[in-house]
Amino acid sequence: GNFSFTTINLPKLALEAKGDLGKFWELYDYYIDLCHDYLLDRLKIIEEKHIYNYPFLMGQGVWLDSEKASPVDSIKEVLKHASYSIGFCGLAECLVALIGKHHGESEEAQKLGLEIVGHMRERTDAYTEAEHRNWSTFGTPAESTAGQFQRANKRVYGTIPGVTDRSYMTNSSHVPVYY
């Protein structure tokens, strides 16, 4: 199963970059690293828990190899089968903030959107290779997060047409429903 995931607010990075693609990529890499490190820190804490701390997940054999462990064993060995995901939200608004159009409106935006998602995938694939853990890129289905991120962006950057002018941003890589 998925151990945990965290989500990057893509429009925030685009707004911080102020249309500068070089700055956007720099911020994007920084936040991908931050998410990676956060998930590893969380793993260090959780893997010290025991099978008995998770009676349903571990006791019912839901996780691979949990059936081989005794109740007092650490869940560390079981967690080696888990996935660790870095997600994203608001690709459409990110693209509007960077180049003025989203991926449903122009080929240039679609190409850049694919590069943004592809870059995260390359980074998570590199983590998988280096650490022998199951890292993945996750298009976050984030109804509540999309609203929270949008409110935070609007509070900091104000109302920006196509970026912060709605009560929520798009989930993951969706084309806006209003388009």
Placement of each model-derived feature along the sequence:
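Conserved catalytic cores of very large enzyme subunits
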Residues: 1-81, 97, 101-102, 106-179
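Extended amphipathic alpha-helical segments enriched in small hydrophobics
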Residues: 86-95
